[in-house]
Amino acid sequence: MKYRTHRCNELSLSNVGERVRLSGWVHRYRNHGGVVFIDLRDRFGITQIVCREDEKPELHQLVDSVRSEWVLSIEGTVCRRLEGMENANLATGEIEVDIEKVDILSKAKNLPFSISDDHIHVNEELRLEYRYLDMRRGQILDRLVHRHKVMMACRQYMDKQGFTEVVTPILGKSTPEGARDYLVPSRIYPGSFYALPQSPQLFKQILMVGGLDRYFQIATCFRDEDLRADRQPEFAQIDIEMSFGTPNDLFPIIEQLVVEMFAVQGIKIDLPLPRMTYQEAKDLYGTDKPDLRFGLQLHDCREHAKEFSFSIFLDQLAQGGTIKGFCVPGGADMSRKQLDVYTEFVKRYGAMGLVWIKKQESGIASNVAKFASEAVFQAMFADFGAQNNDILLLIAAPEDVANQSLDHLRRLIAKERNFYNEAQYNFVWITDFPLFAKEDGKICSEHHPFTSPLDEDIPLLDKDPLSVRSSSYDLVLNGYEIASGSQRIHNADLQNKIFSILELSPESIKEKFDFFIDALSFGTPPHLGIALGLDRIMMVLTGAEGIREVIAFPKTQKAADLMMDAPAEIMTSQLKELSIKVTS
């Protein structure tokens, strides 16, 4: 049996009079007084099928019994629709198929939600439980097709650039990379475990030691961490590594890769992409992931704050804190009620309050007006570039609190006041991150322990490790980190020194990294790499609300697969075979 001669988006007036066979799902069904209309849908489109009772009574009775989402294969003749009955919203909207034969291939139970009307809001958990039905609503499938095309563009481009695609192991060894590992027990080696890779980091570096020179892979990675809208326990990244290069060699390759990927969606990206150091990003935007679709740059107000008699300003200055803020063009129209809402908003991020200063033709209005002279306010307006009807919003707090609060506030205000176009794509490279950070009183890696320090900062490793900058870089798009990478350490002595600063004992280094240190000791080329978050890129490209919308079978916010009901308990016999006892 041949299931179709055409797809459901292909028939047009040029096919009128042809006998055709179509297969697909019943998208909509209508009985108009003896005339049954069926919208037959496949992945490619919809074709209207018609059956008239007065012409084919037995066939009409069968067709009249079908219901939504039944799978049919029909034969019939292509006809022109009656004048005035055309549907300009369909590629096949000028024709219909007069049915002559129907085969019911599969029936469907009553649906948990509507497939034909994708404007109806459906609870996300219900959508994930019935993901196969959710796919039929169209939007998910469209995004998966776009994802496929982006992946194909990536592979073709990387091949032209001389990169070799290599599949690295999924079962590996647990090594500290920042998040918790997913562990897989070994039946053959009781009490021992594999770890699913958080990234192919060590494997791709060892490929460089092995002389591959240029590697890439669209890799599946796993991290057991708390989830957010743009995080999943398993995710895909475009993983890249190259030998004998510097960031200045790598950046143009990645920039052109971005151009190729976005061209799939018909989006033009201008090159070269701008660059900004980590410190510049923090100073100007309060974050290392700045959204550059709008301005609202931060200004340091500490010198002006010294002229205030406002105790909160003076206390922060005395404690080594900061006073900074930004100017909102036209923001003097903000009501006191709205400013109170913003004040409560920044308190979520640790700020104690929000200072506002309006520049109006009638004069200055501010909640700190009595604490400084008009000359001080005018000097601030000049520094901020404020015009009449603008408002300054300031926060006095420790540096990290002020930055985080202002970062979120500027994003919120920019969105509320339509300061940018959603279809706008602003990239920026962020470079020269700190090599180390301090968490819970301990030094830890800002990226991962295989990142090389900047050459000029290596002497600081012994004296002041927290001031050492790394040869690392992130690519940020519209406030999202979509790629992260670094120059790698290719010297075993330097790698051991970094491990030592991270307070890894010689025993721990030997246990976890002996194979890697050994590899570095056999002649390792300088190398660097990057990983682009494919899920996050697709989220931005398609305008999806989160990465669950661009993944075929995603997990929930609690890392559960509602369709397969995973994770799930396993049989006692399986646990026994793996020498595992469950204690809770």
UniProtKB/Swiss-Prot annotation:
Organism: Chlamydia abortus (strain DSM 27085 / S26/3) (Chlamydophila abortus)
Enzyme class at the top of the EC tree: ligase
GO cellular component: cytoplasm
Main location: cytoplasm
Assembly information from the UniProt record: Homodimer.
Name of the gene: aspS
InterPro entries reported for this sequence: Aa-tRNA-synt_II, aa-tRNA-synth_II, aa-tRNA-synth_II/BPL/LPL, Asp-tRNA-ligase_1, Asp-tRNA-ligase_1_N, Asp/Asn-tRNA-synth_IIb, AspRS_core, GAD-like_sf
Protein EC: 6.1.1.23
Stretches that traverse the bilayer: none
Residues under site feature: Important for tRNA non-discrimination: 32, 84
Annotated GO MF terms: aspartate-tRNA ligase activity; aspartate-tRNA(Asn) ligase activity; ATP binding; nucleic acid binding
GO biological process: aspartyl-tRNA aminoacylation
Keywords: Aminoacyl-tRNA synthetase, ATP-binding, Cytoplasm, Ligase, Nucleotide-binding, Protein biosynthesis
NCBIfam families for this protein: aspS_bact (TIGR00459), PRK00476.1 (NF001750)
Family per record: Belongs to the class-II aminoacyl-tRNA synthetase family. Type 1 subfamily.
The protein's name: Aspartate--tRNA(Asp/Asn) ligase
